[in-house]
């Protein structure tokens, strides 16, 4: 893209970066139909629907 001077050592990183310029969001939540450019963002988002909290504090258990 014009004005973008980013470089990447891996093609998958470039593919992910290009989505910033194109607005392409290929990952869709099946519950609310919201779209995301990255699969890890979709995974985190789905937890808002399921209530899953996979990380607990080692000190207090919360």
UniProtKB/Swiss-Prot annotation:
Keyword Transcription: yes
Location relative to the cell: Nucleus
Family: Belongs to the EGR C2H2-type zinc-finger protein family.
Keywords of this entry: Activator, DNA-binding, Metal-binding, Nucleus, Repeat, Transcription, Transcription regulation, Zinc, Zinc-finger
Pfam families assigned to the protein according to its UniProt record, in alphabetical order: zf-C2H2 (PF00096)
Biological function: Sequence-specific DNA-binding transcription factor. Binds to two specific DNA sites located in the promoter region of HOXA4.
Main location: nucleus
Molecular function in Gene Ontology: DNA-binding transcription factor activity, RNA polymerase II-specific; RNA polymerase II cis-regulatory region sequence-specific DNA binding; zinc ion binding
Record's GO cellular component terms: nucleus
Record protein name field: Early growth response protein 2
């Amino acid at each position: 893209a014009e004005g973008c001077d980013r470089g990447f050592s891996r093609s998958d990183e470039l593919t992910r970066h290009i989505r910033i310029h194109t607005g392409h969001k290929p990952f869709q939540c099946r519950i609310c139909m919201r779209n995301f450019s990255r699969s890890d963002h979709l995974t985190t988002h789905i937890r808002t629907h399921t209530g899953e909290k996979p990380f607990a504090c080692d000190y207090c258990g919360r």
